[in-house]
């Protein structure tokens, strides 16, 4: 009679494998359930984007037509690329395009530097009550409308009764006609934009900073590292993903601008159009003159250029993120 040998090692290994399979099955079911939950959570947002962004995009066909309101979109004659030719031949186009890109570049740099600086200061603060107070102060301007912000700017820079001119007059100086001085408005608009948006940017960066271990910064302090060294060597490398995310969002709109902001802050003063006219304000006036095909061509060009810019930054971000991971690990 053949003896059956009992190998405890084989039994133990088989048990481990069975447990691993069971655990893997549980994890897979959990992942599937989580994916379904995330899908239904994001579904309303996806529907809103499709309804309000993708479906209306079909009206860009106007850019290729000689659109007449009385004849409608379908009844209007095809114009091919004529509207785009007129756009590029417009004598103001290059100047306005440059204004738009420069403004958005300045917005991106100033807002991100201010937001990252504020978030880092909050992260380094120890007192929770002070953190909460300053976060509220930073975010509050974001909820102020540009109409009200425009009134604040007008109260400061009004040619006749502005606070700044009153202070200048008090010290014996001559009043400055701010709304007839184009050179100062890029600075005013950039500072106003930063005041309104840097707080929200700081919230995003502050959330990213929460993933950093305080032990690392404390160890660096014990080794004698200064604040700048801690920021550049510990904090910044770990929030690069958030920096790139904000960069992609901002770069995608580099050829667009906030129409309400420019009109409310400048009050559409003709004397400063040279430095405050951007694509949105210029071509919105084209819509007011019923030249809708021309304005649609400008809008389509803005969207296409923004998509290309965002794609370029996304590729750059992916490459830099992979390089950073290789350097760390």
Model-identified regions with their sequence ranges:
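A structural signal for multi-pass alpha-helical bundles of membrane permease subunits
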Residues: 30-329
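Short, Lys/Arg-rich, polar N-terminal cytosolic tail immediately upstream
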Residues: 2, 6-32
């Amino acid at each position: 009679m053949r003896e059956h040998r009992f190998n405890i090692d084989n039994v133990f290994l088989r048990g481990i494998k069975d447990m691993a399979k069971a655990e893997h099955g549980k994890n897979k079911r959990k992942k599937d359930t989580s994916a379904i939950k995330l899908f239904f959570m994001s579904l309303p947002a996806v529907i809103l984007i499709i309804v309000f962004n993708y479906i209306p995009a079909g009206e860009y066909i106007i850019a290729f037509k000689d659109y007449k309101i009385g004849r409608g979109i379908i009844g209007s004659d095809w114009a091919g690329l004529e509207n785009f030719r007129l756009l590029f031949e417009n004598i103001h186009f290059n100047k306005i395009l440059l204004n738009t890109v420069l403004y958005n570049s300045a917005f991106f740099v100033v807002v991100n530097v201010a937001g990252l600086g504020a978030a880092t200061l909050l992260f380094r603060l120890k007192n929770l009550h002070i953190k909460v107070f300053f976060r509220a102060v930073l975010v509050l301007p974001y909820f102020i409308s540009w109409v009200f912000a425009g009134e604040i700017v007008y109260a400061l820079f009004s040619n006749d009764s502005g606070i700044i001119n009153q202070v200048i007059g008090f010290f014996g100086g001559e009043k400055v006609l701010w709304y007839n001085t184009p050179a100062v408005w890029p600075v005013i608009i950039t500072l106003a934009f930063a005041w309104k948006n840097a707080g929200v940017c700081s919230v995003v960066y502050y959330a990213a900073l929460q993933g950093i271990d305080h032990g690392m910064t404390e160890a660096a302090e014990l080794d004698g590292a200064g604040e700048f060294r801690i920021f550049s060597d510990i904090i910044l490398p770990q929030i690069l993903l958030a920096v790139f995310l904000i960069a992609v969002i901002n770069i995608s709109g580099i050829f667009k601008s906030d129409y309400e902001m420019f009109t409310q802050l400048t009050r559409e003063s003709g004397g400063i159009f040279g430095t405050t006219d951007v694509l949105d304000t210029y071509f919105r006036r084209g819509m007011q003159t019923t030249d809708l095909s021309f304005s649609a061509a400008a809008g389509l060009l803005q969207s296409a250029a923004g998509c290309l810019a965002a794609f370029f930054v996304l590729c750059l971000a992916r490459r830099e993120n992979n390089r950073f991971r290789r350097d760390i690990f």
